């Protein structure tokens, strides 16, 4: 069963009612948007544990992780478009000292994580990200989603890892949910998470969740922990 435990009352007002969560030191439960969903029907935990034991090095260095996302030709065509040029401008603004080759490589990596061309949208609302319980959000990670999309994924996928195409290194029984806020109205690039595979196909994820690419994280607030959710 998945639950979402809230940690900061200030953020509860930003999300719609759903499953039950409880503030630390609070006496009564508070509704949050992550619903209760069925237990995972994906690969049994003992099988995943065995894979982790045998392939610890490959899992840790992500050397076998592959994304079946956009091909290079589609990415190059997108980068020549208006939205693609905006994507590149925001990458350059995030790291003005980076070379053109570095900016291009980052663009390819981020865009290839999706199976669809990103739609450029203005955004003035919060976004969220899940990380294994106890870990922090990288200050450079561009991959986020909305609380509504997290709710949708938790209801229709065997695991959140499956819907979001996570590598084994990033999969956990329990995730911390972090929220960021835009500093005004900013651009986001919305695409569908591509299928992924790892360890030569021993582990496959179907993807399909909606992701929000943020090529310039300096336009957003620092992440704030707002709760937890089960895989």
Predicted segments with their positions:
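Bacterial N-terminal signal peptides that target proteins for export
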Residues: 1-8
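Long, low-complexity, intrinsically disordered regions
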Residues: 21-134, 141
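Short, solvent-exposed coil/turn linker segments
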Residues: 3, 44-47, 58-61, 146, ...
